[in-house]
Amino acid sequence: WSPQQDSALKAVSAWLKDRDGPQVFRLFGWAGTGKSTLAVHLAQDVRNVKFAAFTGKAALVMRKRGCKGAQTIHSLIYTLVSEKDGEPRFVLDDESPAADADLIVIDEVSMVDEQLGRDLLSFGVKVLVLGDPFQLPPVQGAGFFTADEPDMMLTEIHRQAADNPIIHLSMQVREGGFLERGRY
C-alpha cells in the first residue's frame, strides 16, 4: 500500500470499529487512486458486506474489481410492488439484504440523490461511500453524499492507472493545463 492508501485503510478500519461513530465514511479520490481496491481489502474483515452502485454498469465494474455480488442500490433496498400504466412502482424493502449487512459499500456516489441516500441510511448500517468529487455531476437531483467534505481524499494515481490516457488527460485538466488538439 502507498502511504496515502495505508492512512485510508487505518481511518476506515477505525471508523468501522467505532459503533457510536458516524454512519457514513466518505472515501473519495480521483480515478485510479485505488478506492475500489481498498474497499475490497477492507471488506475481507467484515462478516456481511453488500456492494452496490447507482447504475448496473457501475455494479458490473465493481464485480470485475472483486466486489462480490455488487448490484444496483435500487435492487439492494427496494422491491417491486406493482405496475401502474406500464410504470413499475417500487417501495423500500425492510427485509432487504441491506437490513442484515454489517457494511454497505457504495461506489459512484455522485449519482445518489437525497431520497435514495436517506432510504439507504434508513437501515442503520454503516455505509462506506466511494466517489470522485471532480466527476461531472448529473443534470439534477444528486450529490447527497458528495455535498459534505470527504473523510479521506486519495490523490495519488497508481501505476496500473497512470498510463491510462483518459486519466492522464483528466489530471492535466485538473491541474490547470490545456489539452492540445489532436487524436487521443
Mark where each language-model region is.
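Conserved ATP-binding/catalytic motifs of P-loop helicase motor domains
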Residues: 1-184
